[in-house]
């Protein structure tokens, strides 16, 4: 019986025909395969001529290597049963009994805490209970027990729902905070000016009430008005100021506070050494001046970093320029006085 070869080309044959450079050096170039008459077999297919499957690996001893080192390991019954048990890929993710019990009890506890606190505040916890009160208490306990059993039975469902709700809420709040912070960052300069003006108005109203006697405050509080204003301005404007400049803001506020403290110490120390003290009007003037000066310096330092550091140099330059102008004026007057009388007569005739 003749062997029939059907015109079928495998993917391996197609790959070998495409790769012209892959030639076996021992057997030479690949012969052409004529699938119609079957006279030429596929390349390197001498094993297909063998009818006995045992003789298929005679020409190629490496085809069926029975070396023990390459044989697969012998899997015992324990390993096979272990593989069968974990073949589905499912693991036991159920929570322990006590944890489920505790988490299911937390909502009941949170629900009862306000009621217990309210009854304790009213001094009506288990006091003067009549029939109706005990019936209500029993119904409440039964309702709590049913809710607890429901939470324990449907633990997986409601915990997943709560976790998803918390996740969605957190993402939404984060987006809202991001949008608000970006909006405030874009208008931070205008917001700082508005906040400063509003706080200035509030302090002016406070001073008016103190002056009229409707509000009695200690002098120490009036002295510290400048510090309070700076701190409140920092707290409110910290929303408008980017977080990465918060350290710089604290540094500028510390400089302003030190400057204000120095002025207060110098003024009060001078008055104390002279045996005098500020009257009520003097305290108001001092507090108002320190308040306005502190806020103006703080805003200038925030808008123009290094203003306080450059202030002594600017003051020295200003004083030097002023003195230089006076010196030039005096020198010019002296030069005019040194002109000879003959030259003055010639100039007058001309």
From Swiss-Prot:
Polar residues: bias regions: 57-72
Region span, Disordered: 1-92
Pfam family, one: WTF
Segments crossing the lipid bilayer: 97-117, 134-154, 165-185, 190-210, 226-246, 253-273, 280-300
Basic and acidic residues composition-biased segments: 11-29
GO CC, alphabetical: ascus epiplasm; cytoplasm; endoplasmic reticulum membrane; vacuolar membrane
Alphabetical GO biological process terms: meiotic drive
Keywords from the named record: Cytoplasm, Endoplasmic reticulum, Membrane, Toxin, Transmembrane, Transmembrane helix, Vacuole
Assembly and interaction partners: Homomer. Forms protein aggregates. The two isoforms can interact with each other and with themselves. High sequence similarity is required for their interaction.
Function of the molecule: Promotes unequal transmission of alleles from the parental zygote to progeny spores by acting as poison/antidote system where the poison and antidote proteins are produced from the same locus; the poison component is trans-acting and targets all spores within an ascus whereas the antidote component is spore-specific, leading to poisoning of all progeny that do not inherit the allele.
Record family assignment: Belongs to the WTF family.
Descriptive protein name: Meiotic driver wtf30
């Amino acid at each position: 019986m003749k062997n029939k070869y059907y015109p079928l080309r495998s993917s391996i044959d197609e790959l070998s025909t495409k790769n012209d450079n892959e030639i076996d050096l021992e057997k030479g170039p690949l012969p052409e395969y004529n699938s119609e008459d079957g006279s030429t077999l596929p390349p390197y297919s001498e094993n297909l001529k063998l009818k006995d499957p045992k003789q298929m690996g005679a020409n190629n001893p490496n085809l069926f290597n029975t070396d023990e080192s390459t044989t697969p390991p012998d899997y015992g019954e324990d390993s096979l049963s272990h593989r069968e048990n974990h073949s589905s890929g499912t693991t036991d993710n159920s929570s322990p009994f006590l944890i489920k019990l505790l988490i299911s009890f937390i909502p009941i506890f949170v629900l009862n805490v306000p009621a217990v606190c309210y009854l304790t505040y009213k001094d009506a916890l288990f006091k003067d209970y009549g029939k109706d009160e005990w019936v209500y208490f029993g119904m409440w306990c039964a309702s709590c027990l049913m809710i607890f059993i429901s939470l324990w039975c449907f633990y997986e469902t409601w915990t997943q729902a709560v976790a998803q709700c918390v996740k969605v809420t957190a993402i939404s709040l984060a987006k809202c905070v991001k949008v608000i912070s970006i909006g405030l960052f874009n208008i931070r300069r205008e917001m700082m000016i508005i906040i400063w003006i509003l706080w200035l108005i509030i302090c002016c109203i406070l001073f008016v009430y103190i002056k009229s006697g409707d509000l009695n405050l200690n002098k120490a509080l009036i002295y510290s008005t400048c510090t309070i204003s700076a701190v409140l301005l920092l707290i409110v404007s910290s929303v408008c100021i980017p977080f990465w400049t918060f350290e710089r803001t604290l540094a500028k506020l510390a400089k302003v506070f030190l400057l204000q403290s120095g002025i207060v110490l110098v003024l009060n120390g001078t008055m104390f050494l002279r045996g005098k003290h500020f009257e009520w009007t003097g305290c108001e003037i001092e507090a108002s001046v320190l308040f306005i000066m502190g806020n103006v310096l703080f805003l200038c330092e925030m808008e123009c970093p290094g203003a306080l550091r450059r202030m002594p140099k600017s003051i020295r330059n200003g004083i030097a320029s002023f003195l230089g102008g006076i010196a030039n004026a005096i020198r010019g007057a002296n030069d005019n006085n040194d002109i000879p009388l003959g030259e003055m007569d010639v100039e007058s005739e001309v």
